[in-house]
Amino acid sequence: MRRTRFISVCLSFVACVIFLAARAQKDEEIARLEKVMGWKAGQVVADVGAGEGEFGFGAARVVGETGKVYLTELDEKKRKALEDEVKRREAKNKVVNVMVVQAAEKQTNLPDNCCDGIILRRVYHHITAPDEMDASLLRSLKPGGVLAVIEFPPRKGLTESDPVKGVPANRGGHGIPQKILVAELTHAGFAVDQTINDWPDDSYCVVFRKTAP
């Protein structure tokens, strides 16, 4: 009985440590995104493929009531969960400026020229129609707006399909080579603003800018 209880306590402790480490990493990423993207009060920011929305909610705290944040999600269950989370935070007066948008395979479903900044965190390597999506991302940004793409090099042996089903064959595994990411987005009309190769969890971040017409 004591042994079982001891094991249970140990497992709970390990789970707590893992959770806190993951939370600290996300907080670090949010702080770095704020810096490299230049978030300011009153701006409009979108988190495309937002998942649980941590990065979009992080942006919402910075842009404030005079700004706006879009959280887009393709998966219907995740989108509904985001909507529920927004309502929960609104009820506690934690957010007043966040809108959830149903994403699409080939476009952001965001208004044209609406965003000062767009985040794609570990999303780009899932995109099955990069030419169309890249064009949509460009349209969604204001002139001078920034696009921050966080990705990781191709990896073998992940639990998901390897590479992701339906993506271009040049990915080389689950993930995307930085060189290919940059080539595709510059071809779409973006300009590289900066490249950060020491992003947490063996990832990289490339910040692009939509040049003024």
Stretches with model-predicted labels:
Residues C114-D131:
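A short SAM/SAH-binding and catalytic strip from SAM-dependent methyltransferases
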Residues Q25-Q43:
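Conserved alpha-helix/loop element of class I SAM-dependent methyltransferases that forms part
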Residues K40-Q43, T108-I118:
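A short acidic, Gly/Pro-enriched loop at the edge of an enzyme's catalytic core
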Residues G173-A188, V192-T195:
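Short alpha-helix
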Residues A60, D131-V146:
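A short glycine-rich, Lys/Arg-flanked "PGG" loop and its adjoining helix->strand segment in the class I
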Residues A46-T108:
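Class I SAM-dependent methyltransferase SAM/SAH-binding core
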Residues V192-P213:
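Core SAM-dependent methyltransferase catalytic element
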